[in-house]
């Protein structure tokens, strides 16, 4: 267990609004497209602080923030196994959405990335 912890939160204020559906949830309304305003909290731990007395240098997290924005900022998140995946790409070709594929969608699956 780490001795020092630090957290970084990317909240609703940076515009992480995405839409997705659960293609395997044919028993509920979750198989329909629905949108979320997303937020992410990352916790970092270390046994020894760096020379600035930090557990993590937040300045080094710019690539993480960019990945979050590229993946979730007004994006249509599609499960790679969604049987209707091509239809989302048809919408993207018409400039009606921006598709990002994931190996599973939902809060739990997004946390795995």
Where are the predicted features?
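Charge-rich, low-complexity N-terminal segments
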Residues: 1-113
